[in-house]
Regions:
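Active-site and donor-binding regions of nucleotide-sugar-utilizing enzymes
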Residues: 6, 10-13, 17-28, 68-171
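Structural beta-sheet core signal
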Residues: 9-11, 37-39, 126, 174, ...
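Cofactor-binding loop segments of dinucleotide-utilizing enzymes, especially the Rossmann-like FAD-
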Residues: 12-13, 39-42, 129, 177, ...
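A generic structural motif
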Residues: 30-36, 243-246
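Conserved nucleotide-sugar phosphate-binding/catalytic loop shared by glycosyltransferases and other
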Residues: 34-78, 88
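A nucleotide-sugar donor-handling region in carbohydrate enzymes
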Residues: 43-46, 148-228
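Donor-nucleotide binding loops and adjacent catalytic segments primarily
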Residues: 55, 191-284
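Glycine-rich, highly charged phosphate/nucleotide-binding loops
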Residues: 61-62, 75-91, 194-205
Length: 284
C-alpha cells in the first residue's frame, strides 16, 4: 500500500524496549503504517546491556542508530548528552520525515527526542506521562507532556494529572502500560518459562530461582549522586544478610551510575554473596 504513515519510535534505554515491544509489533504489522525504529543512548552500549541485540533478534529492523551518551556519569554529562541527542535526532528526523514520533516515559534522553521532533513540527506521542516519581525524571516527564500532542497514559490518575497540566482531554488516552502485554503473554504461554541464568548469564552465585526470589535494581539519586556508592553498599549488605536468592540488575546511565557500579563490583569481589546473581539485562 502506498502512502503509509511513517511512525518513528525512539528507544533510548533497555527498559523502553520491553515496555513497547507489543506496540512495535502492532505498528510493524499494520497495513497502513511503516515502522521507523531509532535506537539511541544507553540501548546501544554494552555496559548497559546492549539492548539492540535483543531488538534485532526479535526481528525488528533498526532504521537508525544514534550514539549520544557522554562518559562521566555526572550531571554535566547528562546535560551534554541531552544536547548532543537533540542535535543528532534532529538530523535523523529531518532525513526520515516521520508522520509522528513516539517517545517513552521520563529519561533525559527522551526530552532530546521531544525537542528535536517538536521544533520540526512533527506530531509527538508520549507514552506514560502524568506519573509521579520524584527527582529530575519527574520534571522531564512533565516537560515531555507539555511538548507532546498525544498522550498515552497508564492509569486514570496519570490521565487526570496530564489534563490538569492543560492538555486537551480528547488527546489523553488511558491505554495502560503496554508492558502488561508481555506479562500476560508469559503467563499464558508456559513455553516462555526459561532458565534466566542460562539465557542471560551474569556473574555471581548459581542461585536457586525456582522458589521465591528477589529482583533488585537500584539507580543513583541524581540530586545526591555523590552518595551513590555508599547508598548501594547499604542495600547490598542488607540483601546479603537476608540470604534470599536475588537477581540484581545493573544501574542506568544517570549521574552517579559510576559510583553505583563501583559499589556493586567492590562488594561482589570482597564478599562474593552466595545469594546474589548480577545481570546487565533481562528482556523477554
Amino acid at each position: 500500500m502506498k502512502n503509509k504513515r511513517k511512525i518513528c519510535v525512539v528507544i533510548t534505554a533497555r527498559p523502553s524496549y520491553s515496555r513497547v515491544k507489543t506496540a512495535l509489533l502492532a505498528i510493524k504489522n499494520h497495513p497502513q503504517l511503516e515502522l521507523q525504529l531509532v535506537i539511541a543512548g544507553s540501548a546501544l552500549l554494552g555496559r548497559y546491556g546492549n539492548a539492540i541485540e535483543f531488538i534485532e533478534k526479535d526481528g525488528f529492523e533498526v532504521t537508525e542508530k544514534v550514539y549520544m551518551v557522554l562518559e562521566g556519569e555526572n550531571r554535566t554529562a547528562m546535560a551534554k548528552t541531552t544536547g548532543l541527542g537533540v542535535i543528532e535526532l534532529a538530523n535523523v528526523f529531518y532525513n526520515l520525515k516521520p508522520d509522528a514520533v513516539i517517545t517513552i516515559a521520563d529519561r533525559f534522553e527522551t526530552i532530546a527526542t521531544s525537542i528535536a521532533a517538536t521544533y520540526q513540527n512533527i506530531p509527538l506521542v508520549h507514552i506514560q506521562g502524568g506519573e509521579v516519581t520524584g527527582n529530575i525524571d519527574e520534571k522531564v516527564r512533565h516537560a515531555n507532556t507539555k511538548l507532546a500532542d498525544i498522550h498515552l497514559v497508564a492509569s486514570e490518575n496519570a490521565k487526570e494529572r496530564v489534563i490538569k497540566l492543560g492538555e486537551n482531554p480528547d488527546f489523553v488516552i488511558n491505554t495502560g502500560c503496554p508492558s502488561i502485554d508481555i506479562a500476560k503473554e508469559v503467563n499464558d504461554k508456559p513455553e516462555l518459562n526459561f532458565d534466566p541464568i542460562k539465557k542471560y548469564g551474569g556473574v555471581g552465585s548459581e542461585i536457586n530461582w525456582k522458589n521465591e526470589y528477589l529482583v533488585v535494581m537500584q539507580h543513583p539519586v541524581t540530586t545526591e549522586y555523590e552518595e551513590a556508592k555508599e547508598d548501594v553498599l547499604k542495600t547490598l549488605k542488607a540483601i546479603a544478610e537476608l540470604n534470599i536468592p536475588t537477581f540484581w540488575f545493573w544501574p542506568n546511565v544517570d549521574a552517579g551510575a559510576d559510583g553505583t557500579s563501583s559499589g556493586i563490583r567492590s562488594f561482589r569481589e570482597l564478599h562474593n554473596p552466595k545469594n546474589i546473581r548480577f545481570l546487565k539485562i533481562w528482556s523477554h
